Amino acid sequence: MKNKKFKRVLVILGGTSGERAVSLNSGKACIKALKKKKYSVSTLDPKFKNINLIDKRKIDVIFNALHGKDGEDGVAQSYFEYLKIPYTHSGVISSYNAMNKLVSKDLFIKNKILTPNFFSAHRAEKKINNIKKILIKKKMYFPLVIKPVNQGSSLGVKIAKNFKDFKKITLHLFKNYEQLMFENHIGGQEIQAAVINNRAIGAIELIPKRTFYDYKAKYSKAANTQHIMPARLDRKNYKKVLSISSKAHKVLGCKGVTRADFKFFKNKFYLLEINTQPGMTNLSLVPEIAN
């Protein structure tokens, strides 16, 4: 947002996804920062005002502060493209690639970026016993991470410690999500890195008090997640995680800012996912890394 010809900024925030609260907080933080820089700022919340009512004659650029479904999966971006209005963050295809964990993992593997072993199942075509057979065939083990294919902010992410957990969690999640991904749980350090305009700017380490870095650990002060900046890595590995982050950003075709989520275990970095609409709240990691 350094281009001063973009003086009139429309911040789109809120929306109707499960990440609405985070989006509102991110949007408010961005509005405050933009006003401080003397931009003319207007707002739109798709929950209360149809996004089709955007009047492109009154704005120069859209700051997309939406999170989750329709906001960071290429849907909103495709409408911005239709209106021919410049907007922040990644484009249609890269947003879809990053939001769909199966697509992004496939791209990671094709580009030799290490990611945890996984497979997916659709509720309409798989039974629990069939999924169990696939687990055995693919030599996957417990604990196992089970997550929706296209959700952000760790919504719906669960960890199964045994087959009893696995069955209970899978049946529960299939009530709300059509497709799930099953992924080997990787121990070790939780590392996240920020990339801005293709350049990785830093990496932070997280020590959650909860079982893992879930939604509450990310956005609740009460969760008491410890942030260590910079991450406790030697010089070689610190440079390596930044390099992988930048590579993944480019592989997915991203632009602007992204956040890469890793586990560092036995001297290897496992890339979990790329977030194209990272949070901008006072608890969010990208602002902390940037500062």
PLM features: residue spans?
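Conserved metal-phosphate-binding beta-hairpin within the catalytic cores
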Residues: 184, 193-195, 249-282, 290
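Phosphate-binding site of ATP-dependent enzymes
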Residues: 161-243, 263-270
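Active-site nucleotide/adenylate-binding loops and adjacent lid/helix of ATP-dependent enzymes
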Residues: 1-13, 41, 56-57, 97-189
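ATP-binding N-terminal substructure of ATP-dependent carboxylate-amine bond-forming enzymes
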Residues: 1-99, 103, 122-132
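A short, polar/charged loop-to-alpha-helix boundary motif
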Residues: 211-213, 217, 281-289
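Short, intrinsically disordered, charge-balanced linker/junction segments flanking boundaries
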Residues: 116, 288-291
